[in-house]
C-alpha cells in the first residue's frame, strides 16, 4: 500500500506521528507536507497529494491542517477525489463504508495525536460497502 500525506504548519506534529505509524505497518508514505512550524499555505501541500490520489498513483491520501476544512475543500476540486473531514473514528468508518473516501482530512486543532492514530487505523481497515452507496457516489461528479 502507498499513501500520500500532506500538512500545513498546524499539522506538523500530527503528520510526523502518522508517518511513523504508517511506516511501522510497512506502508510506503509519500510525504508532501511541511516539517516546519512556520506558517505555510495549505494548498501548496494539498495539490500534490490530491493529484496523486486523483491519478491513482497512490492508494489513499491523508491531509492535516488546523480545521481540516481548507484541505478538504481544496482536495475535493479533483474529479476522482472524495475527501472527508473527520474528527472521530466513527465518522472515519462512515466516510470509508458509505462514501469510499480516498483522502482523510484531519483537523489538528480539534483532535489529539493518539485519537488521530486510531482514526488512521480505522481508515486503513474499513472497506467500502458498495451497493446503494456506489450508486450515490456515481451521482457526485458534475455532468457539464
Indicate residue ranges for each PLM-predicted region.
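Glycine-rich phosphate/diphosphate-binding loop of Rossmann-like nucleotide-binding domains
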Residues: 4-24
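A short beta-strand-loop structural module common to alpha/beta enzyme folds
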Residues: 28-39
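Alpha-helical segments flanking ligand/cofactor-binding loops in enzyme cores
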Residues: 47, 51, 73, 93-96, ...
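C-terminal binding/interaction regions
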Residues: 4-6, 10, 89-144
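Helix-adjacent hinge/juxtasegments
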Residues: 48-85
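Structural motif
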Residues: 38-47
Amino acid at each position: 500500500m502507498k499513501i500520500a500525506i500532506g500538512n500545513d504548519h498546524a499539522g506538523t506534529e500530527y503528520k510526523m506521528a502518522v508517518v511513523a505509524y504508517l511506516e511501522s505497518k510497512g506502508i510506503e508514505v509519500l510525504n508532501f507536507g511541511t516539517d516546519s512550524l512556520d506558517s505555510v499555505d495549505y494548498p501548496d501541500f494539498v495539490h500534490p497529494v490530491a493529484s496523486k490520489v486523483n491519478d491513482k498513483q497512490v492508494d489513499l491520501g491523508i491531509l492535516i491542517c488546523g480545521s481540516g476544512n481548507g484541505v478538504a475543500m481544496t482536495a475535493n476540486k479533483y474529479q476522482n477525489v472524495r475527501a472527508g473531514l473527520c474528527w472521530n473514528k466513527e465518522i472515519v468508518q462512515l466516510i470509508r463504508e458509505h462514501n469510499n473516501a480516498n483522502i482523510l482530512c484531519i483537523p489538528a486543532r480539534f483532535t489529539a495525536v493518539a485519537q488521530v492514530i486510531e482514526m488512521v487505523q480505522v481508515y486503513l481497515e474499513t472497506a467500502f460497502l458498495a451497493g446503494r452507496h456506489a450508486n450515490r457516489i456515481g451521482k457526485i461528479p458534475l455532468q457539464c
